[in-house]
């Protein structure tokens, strides 16, 4: 099957927003218009709308699907969903990684909100071009120009309106196009009847003023336009559109549009802007990666002629087809039934069926081309962030960084039947979400789940109940502490048992030294002359790894330690792997006496937004929670405080902040790094763990 849409006519976009800005409704309306109405003004039978909703209820995944394909104005638009909540930053990161452009949805009453800032910052880091859609223009208190101002004040974004609203709140009835200088008036609430007419007299002056500002802002990004502008020559609409497109793709300019997705106003014009101003895969730099055989950096331009290279960005379990791996093709062509190399894992994978999610159905396709986004069925070893490439032209694309989980809960199945189901459910959820970990406590047999925050774990436990029908009791959230050594030491581990039958004998000398932060455990074999036979050395390493899973102070996993095995002895008959494993664990226990073991705790970067009057309270909250303030900035009448605070001190803070600020304060936190806990706190943690 030949390529249906050229690369120039392909758009891969995401819809990003703060939690309640109306992202889902916007996505839903986009799918609704692109799936059913190919040009504005087509009448639309009620029946088709019904099928669409039924289909959605039956599967419930259309809107939340990782990637949906739609068509608009002769272009293919792939929409990648991004969640708005901070606990799901990995979802946002992984979607930004495979996007070429994005639509940032604002609530036009609130403008830029804290989570908009987080997502905007991440999009800037990834260099993603954006257009802004000020939604909810029909809402009480909606104020388009205030929203535009918040883009300047809070994000320092060079954002300018390319539209103005006609009316607001209940009177919101149309949109002025500042490029064509025409008014689009809506005559019904379906958004299907639009009259294009001259700008109403009372709006003309404002429209001319904002068109002038728009031309000036765009001219500043382009020398040729600037010359024309300064010489007083007229800039044509075509030149203006080309200038906006170039500046938007270079992430120097952000066009702002308005509308109400709920009332079906402005969505089609926003889709026109996606086509006009956001990049195709040809407009962005070629993706870079490393050749695993030569370690040389290579790039893959977006072209069907290049060797196949793709990035898996999400795993989902679908009730109808099983495990789906969503991937973005950067170069080359892939046919279903073919084999690819997962270069991240070094494993060969067979691509079973290839599916594309359409606005309201799934379609099985034979071939995917460069720039496409699709889902494959049948991949066994591939997880989020893995590269899939041609077996003859291997490349490892830059992966998606996965943050370490910082909070954990104990989950306990309510019945024996639940126990078996829970194991399967947790395994599937962990496959889908790399920031979610499942561990079993060796001593107690309890199952512990770990994730990025309380909401993250709540959602996963809820999914376990709803999707997998598992009933479980859930413990209170706990902090994921770590342990390490802060000093170097040498220790002997000697294990000998001789009481009838075959004896046991293992003897090792190990030097322990602190490792760099984040480097984990490293083992070095420095045995000379065979004092410990080669076949027992892996057993020594294994013995250390197993013992370090339950650390020496309070049973938390040990990290960032180097161990060098440098001496020992053995017995011809009695030595065994088991004996050397035990000897290694005894050496670790012995080392703990002199290696200054320490407990580490997760430190969160907390951003607190509160009214200026409450600044004193907020500073007090940070200090009382063993935190340290990193910086402050004023935002209108609010203050934003950035601070590092231990996660252990942040439980229940939402309630404290709410009552101190009469509900006007908000905060967000993300994991930043691990730090030693103070001695007094360390003693409490040890006491608590020994007492249990």
Curated annotation (Swiss-Prot):
Entry's Gene Ontology BP terms: ribosome disassembly
SMART domains associated with the record: EFG_C (SM00838), EFG_IV (SM00889)
Keyword Ubl conjugation: no
Keywords tagged on the record: Cytoplasm, Elongation factor, GTP-binding, Nucleotide-binding, Protein biosynthesis
Span of the signal peptide: none
Cross-referenced Pfam families: EFG_C (PF00679), EFG_III (PF14492), EFG_IV (PF03764), GTP_EFTU (PF00009), GTP_EFTU_D2 (PF03144)
Residues involved in GTP binding: 17-24, 81-85, 135-138
CDD domains associated with the record: EF-G, EFG_III, EFG_mtEFG1_IV, EFG_mtEFG_C, EFG_mtEFG_II
Domain of life: Bacteria
Domain tr-type G residue range list: 8-282
Phosphoprotein recorded as keyword: no
GO CC terms of this entry: cytoplasm
Gene Ontology MF: a single term: translation elongation factor activity
Gene3D superfamilies: 3.30.230.10, 3.30.70.240, Elongation Factor G (Translational Gtpase), domain 3, P-loop containing nucleotide triphosphate hydrolases, Translation factors
Subcellular location as annotated: Cytoplasm
Role: Catalyzes the GTP-dependent ribosomal translocation step during translation elongation. During this step, the ribosome changes from the pre-translocational (PRE) to the post-translocational (POST) state as the newly formed A-site-bound peptidyl-tRNA and P-site-bound deacylated tRNA move to the P and E sites, respectively. Catalyzes the coordinated movement of the two tRNA molecules, the mRNA and conformational changes in the ribosome.
Family to which this protein belongs: Belongs to the TRAFAC class translation factor GTPase superfamily. Classic translation factor GTPase family. EF-G/EF-2 subfamily.
Database matches in HAMAP family: EF_G_EF_2_B
Protein name stated in the entry: Elongation factor G
Organism, scientific name: Streptococcus equi subsp. equi (strain 4047)
Gene that specifies this protein: fusA
